[in-house]
């Protein structure tokens, strides 16, 4: 049985994915929801998340990074309650101390605070190959992800946006 892990960002498109996946969960599939908390979201985003959890009665696991002091040592996973979500820059401050400020040459924010952490959590909880991850992407995301030049080439050669999104998901796995 595959566990479907939906990485909820706190945005509208991501909420729509939660809505769609709730239909699959109601049909008997094993669907779980996670939120990767950076401590740097807008307060209204946190309110939206809390309201969605309450109104839709979903079980949302909120994960944030606990930064290990040692370079080379894996950062650890901290689970916090939905009611504890707030703009406190907790993980961000830890990253700055350990790695310094991110830059174009070293853009580690999303990879360290979201992607690696989500992957490590899922492997720890469900084992390698025991889960499938889902993310909601806005229609304008392929252009940002691929870059304007590559996006135009793909689009002008007939690749629909939904295929680009699927390709992006395959690349991330």
Write out the residue ranges for each language-model feature:
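Nucleotide-activated chemistry modules centered on ATP-dependent adenylation/adenylyltransferase
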Residues: 1-173
